[in-house]
């Protein structure tokens, strides 16, 4: 009986740490600045990326720089990184080379962010709350490598670690999806408005993840209409 209870306890603990879950209507909450709180995402990725689109929603009152999506490989720091430099300024980094985009944004307001990149042209596109921002170009002809460590809540300085709390994310993050293609403007708008478009790398409805430290899952309290109001 004791062994059965022990196994049951371990099973429950593991289910809280590692899970594949439909997170529709929910968010990851990172409630404090730290170097220990994060969520690791496990992608469905078998070959290098020649194209991608990544979308997610965030809600934070941070004014300092912070990481939004950190994708490292064993041989490359910042193989793919989304970094918020300051209010109204985002950076997309591929193999440590960055493209910075700037636009109008309200402080402490919910944000829906999308970025796409195409290897053949090197063109990166950015969308904030359904509005296209200026296109940039970087790493034409490159392919983003596989077997990544993908971290939300922290910026990796090495594979799966090297965190600095001054770069940590504090707030809510949800509706994160990643495709191995460049979505059309119509598809971006549809996703922004709350429609579901099945994603083949990371899908919020079938997400594999591991939670570490003080990161929790809660119902999303910010209505989708709130994103529409500020666009």
UniProtKB/Swiss-Prot annotation:
Known SUPFAM superfamilies for this protein? Answer: Concanavalin A-like lectins/glucanases (SSF49899)
- What is the protein name given in its UniProt record? Female protein
The entry marks the following residues as binding Ca(2+) 2, namely: 155, 157, 167
Q: Does the keyword Signal apply?
A: yes
Which positions form S-S bridges?
55-114
Output the Gene Ontology cellular-component terms: extracellular space
The note on cofactor binding and number reads: Binds 2 calcium ions per subunit.
The UniProt family comment states:
Belongs to the pentraxin family.
Q: Which Pfam families does this chain map to? A: Pentaxin (PF00354)
Task: State the UniProt keywords alphabetically.
Answer: Acute phase, Calcium, Disulfide bond, Glycoprotein, Metal-binding, Secreted, Signal
Keyword Glycoprotein in record: yes
